[in-house]
Amino acid sequence: MIVVTNRIPVSKSYEIDFEDRFKKRVHLVDRSPGFVRNEVHRPKPVKFSHETGGWVEDPETQGYYEVKTWWRTLEDFVAWTKSPAFAEAHANRPPAGMFAGPNVLEVHEILTSTDLDV
């Protein structure tokens, strides 16, 4: 099992639009062979304060949204990226200025899990 994570720095003025794009997606990936699940994680702008010993809000921090997809194999994910459905899912380009910088794409293999049999 692998997890593909796309870490995306979204400009603060576009956060609602970015979230709406995922809420309104057509779920093409969900029907792809080997697809397990998809999650979108919203950044929580907090940091640990050594002065107070607790977590405090940090609105100045550039957070990253994380779009995670779980796949049975790397080959299943690669096949998705080469499919017409992938091209269709990514055809509606976001407006200029939506992103505060480049995204970071990472692929990890699940080593251990408390809820999956790996």
Describe every region a protein language model picked out:
Residues I2-I8, E66:
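Active-site-flanking beta-strand signature of metal-NTP-handling nucleotidyl enzymes
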Residues H50-E57, I110-V118:
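Short, low-order "capping/linker" segments at domain edges
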Residues L28-V36, G54-Y64, K68-E106:
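An amphipathic, aromatic/His-enriched active-site/gating alpha helix that lines ligand/cofactor pockets
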Residues V10-F18:
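Short, surface-exposed ligand-recognition loops at beta-strand->loop->(often short) alpha-helix junctions
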Residues F22, V26:
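Short amphipathic alpha-helical/adjacent loop interface patches that line ligand
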Residues H41, E106-H108:
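Solvent-exposed beta-strand sheet faces enriched in polar/charged residues
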